Design a protein with these regions (language model features):
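Helix-to-loop junctions at the C-terminal end of transmembrane segments
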Residues: 79-92, 287-300, 383
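Cytoplasmic helix-loop-helix junction between adjacent transmembrane helices
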Residues: 126-164
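Short amphipathic helix-loop junctions that connect adjacent transmembrane helices
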Residues: 40-63, 256-272
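Juxtamembrane intracellular "pre-TM" segments in multi-pass secondary transporters
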Residues: 6-17, 206-241
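Central cavity-lining transmembrane alpha-helices of secondary-active solute carriers
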Residues: 67-85, 278-290
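C-terminal ends and interior cores of transmembrane alpha-helices
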Residues: 102-117, 310-321
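Cytoplasmic membrane-interface "Motif A"-like loop-to-helix N-cap segments
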Residues: 90-101, 296-308
Length: 413
């Protein structure tokens, strides 16, 4: 039998369930804004920054150093996600969120100090440490799931996704607009943004600590609930995870290195990059809300495969496009990515429910973070040639995944 991922005792009735939903969405928005804030500023910091021990640490190229700085954060999220989920089951969602958000705030402060002191090793270490505590989305989703049916799960998740996309809109905009004030300033802003999150936790979320700790220790809970074991247990999920890895390599090529593309090909600074990124996130927010309104339809897997194909074509076009067309393609690519993100998790949630929702959604997070780390390292090397090569690689892996998804859908939908 599958072990339950949350305590079996139902939560007490909520007096104001909509207030809780709004508090959780606001918490997710502000937390994600802090996570997204550094993305449009790393390319200008490293590639256009001064020639010193930070941007040319150990004589290495700035593109390589930027790739490593990009890679360590999702690597930290990947490692932290194996701990944060079981901890929230054992000690309560609110308590774990309080600890992780406080630790993230401290991590942003360390990143700001490392930039101010031009200490590249400390910057990389702080980005990894911050990643360890940034994987809060799974905990927030679990919190909303705990309160079903007092909060409708489908509608709550739709609002949560929209809040996350708005966070990805607000964060890059803040980062790009504050970078001219100093390289450390965006990270200080990210830390300040998290302070209202801690206030919301205290006043907006009920105390959900279990009356008694679940049987077994934390390590036993982690072994029981970790997601990677699913690829060993289920050959269908293993096949799907490999396709998802190829697809998210392309997606993360866009997420991580579109700022470098805009810097190299369109000569945009931090503010221009932030504006384009904000437009992309706005498109993703609108597409996510539209996808929630129209639902998944009768053949969600086939539709997800088609959107993956559209994304692949867009990435391949971006690798060849002139600067003006690329600045149109980058925001437009957010639309098929959002529809895919709405369809594929919904289909997996229904198809593999027997494995436990937390583990299945955790597998998607694990694959995404793994591909994020991989493309950050590979892209750091290819970026020394041109960001176009990164988009070409991302488009190729996305195209292979899309073809595989189409065949997979014919067999398993």
């Amino acid at each position: 039998m599958l072990s339950p991922s949350v305590p079996s005792d139902p939560p007490a009735p909520l007096r104001h369930p909509k207030l809780l939903l709004w508090a959780v969405c606001a918490l997710a928005l502000m937390s994600t804004a802090g996570v997204a804030l550094p993305y449009p500023i790393l390319a200008p910091i490293f590639v256009n920054g001064p020639v010193d021990d930070f941007t040319h640490f150990m004589g290495l190229r700035p593109e390589l150093l930027m790739g490593l700085a990009l890679a360590v954060n999702p690597a930290g999220i990947l490692a932290g996600s194996l701990v944060v989920g079981p901890m929230s089951d054992r000690y309560g969602r609110r308590r774990v969120l309080s600890i992780t958000i406080t630790a993230t705030l401290v991590g942003y402060g360390l990143s700001a100090y490392a930039l101010a002191s031009r200490d590249y090793p400390l910057f990389v270490l702080s980005r990894f440490a911050t990643g360890l505590t940034e994987g809060n989305v799974a905990v927030v989703r679990a919190l909303l799931a705990d309160w079903h049916p007092q909060l409708d799960r489908t509608r709550s998740f739709a609002w949560l996704n929209a809040s996350l996309y708005i966070g990805w809109l607000v964060g890059p905009l803040l980062g790009g607009l504050t970078l001219p004030w100093g390289e450390a300033v965006p990270f200080l802003v990210a830390a300040v943004v998290l302070v209202p999150c801690l206030v919301l936790l205290g006043v907006g979320l009920p105390d959900d600590r279990p009356a008694a700790a679940p049987e077994g220790g934390l390590l036993a809970a982690m072994r029981r609930q970790q997601s990677l074991g699913l690829v060993v247990q289920d050959p269908v999920l293993r096949h799907l995870a490999l396709l998802q890895l190829a697809y998210t390599l392309g997606v993360n090529a866009l997420y991580e290195f579109a700022p470098l593309w805009m810097l190299q090909q369109a000569d945009l600074g931090s503010r221009g990059i932030a504006i384009v990124t904000a437009v992309q996130c706005a498109a993703m927010t609108a597409a996510s809300l539209f996808a929630a309104r129209i639902g998944s339809g009768p053949v969600p897997l086939h539709r997800a495969a088609r959107f993956a194909l559209v994304a692949a074509v867009g990435l391949l076009a971006l690798s060849l496009a002139p600067s003006w067309l690329g600045l149109v393609l980058i925001p437009a690519l957010g639309i098929p990515l959002s529809f895919y993100n709405a369809l594929m998790p919904a289909w997996m949630s229904e198809r593999f429910a027997a494995h436990g929702q937390g583990r299945v959604m955790g597998l998607l997070t694990t694959v995404f973070c793994l591909s994020n780390t991989m493309i950050a390292i590979i892209g750091g090397v290819l970026g020394m040639l041109s960001a176009r090569w990164i988009m070409l690689l991302g488009g190729a892996t996305c195209l292979l995944a899309a073809i595989g998804f189409i065949r997979f859908a014919r067999r398993h939908s």
